[in-house]
Structure formats: C-alpha cells, structure tokens
Amino acid sequence: MTIKLNELRDNNGARKGRMRVGRGIGSGKGKTAGRGQKGQKARSGVAINGFEGGQMPLHMRIPKRGFNNIFGKDFAIVNLGMVQKLIDAKKLDAKATIDHAALKAAGVARGGKDGVRLLAKGELTAKVTFAVAGASKGAIEAVEKAGGKVELPEARPEGDGKKATRKAEAAAKNA
C-alpha cells in the first residue's frame, strides 16, 4: 500500500468533536451546561488563579526555599574545550589575548554582566593568554600546562572600602 500526501487523514477517533453546551435538555449539556447550579463558578469570566475553594493552595503548602544573594556574581561560564574548538575553527585568534569581548563576539559568552569565568572542562592544546574575571584552579593549571597564561583582576585587600577609611579617620581623630 502506498501513501499519498493527498490521502493522508487522522485515524478514526483521533479528533473528538467539540461538545456544544447549552443547546437544550436533550443534548445532556443543556440549561446549566455542566456548570452545576448558582454560585461564583457558574458565572462567566470567573477563574481565580491559585484559589482552591478555601483549602490551603498548593503554592502556600510548599515551603519557601532559597534567597537572592545580593553579593552574588553573574559570570558567563566558558569551558577550555569550547575555546579550543573555536581556535580550531578560526573563530578565535590564539595569538591575541582572549577576553570577554572576544568570547562574546565568537558567540560563546552569553550574558555574564560580571565577566567570564573559565572552567577546565575539555582539553586545551593552544598556547593562549586569557584576560578573564575568574578561573578555576584546574583551568589555570591546564592553560599554563599548554604554555599560556591567565590574567585575573587584582583582588582588593580586605577592609579597603569606605567603611575602613572612615574607621581609620575616626581612629586618627580620637588619637
């Protein structure tokens, strides 16, 4: 048996006909149209999201979890294996320093308002210099093993902010 495009159709019973409600008592769905008697749910346009008729709603029965860390960093994650693929495909230049802008242009670093974090998944064979916001120990070791280097931003020493300055000024004033 050959199948022709102009003879394709659904199996019998695959599409059930729509029930037309409110069309007389003989239809079985007349008068109240399956909505029961009076009340809020018998009226039109009423559907209260999350309301379960006085029963404690599901979204309130389940415990709250987690929090939003206001100090959390948003890094774009890039693996060494992906960088090597891009170098092999000539989408990245191994001789130039690879930074957030270069990785974004290559289509790897999406988002990451705090920069790029380099991870060690995959293998890197090219000698590359990275200028990134963060890198795992394994990634740094893998890059250095391949003959490259990872330039990370200088970390500020503890107590180098406004509060420490004010404390130092107050101590000098009292002395």
Swiss-Prot record:
GO terms for biological process: translation. It holds the Pfam family Ribosomal_L27A. Keywords: Ribonucleoprotein, Ribosomal protein, RNA-binding, rRNA-binding. GO terms for molecular function: rRNA binding; structural constituent of ribosome. Residues 1-44, 150-175 are annotated as: Disordered. Residues 1-13 have a biased composition (Basic and acidic residues). GO terms for cellular component: cytosolic large ribosomal subunit. Residues 23-37 have a biased composition (Gly residues). InterPro entries: Ribosomal_uL15 (IPR030878), Ribosomal_uL15/eL18 (IPR021131), Ribosomal_uL15/eL18_sf (IPR036227), Ribosomal_uL15_bac-type (IPR005749), Ribosomal_uL15_CS (IPR001196). It comes from the Bacteria. The keyword Aminoacyl-tRNA synthetase does not apply. Binds to the 23S rRNA. Belongs to the universal ribosomal protein uL15 family. Part of the 50S ribosomal subunit. This is Large ribosomal subunit protein uL15. It comes from Sphingopyxis alaskensis (strain DSM 13593 / LMG 18877 / RB2256) (Sphingomonas alaskensis). The gene is rplO.
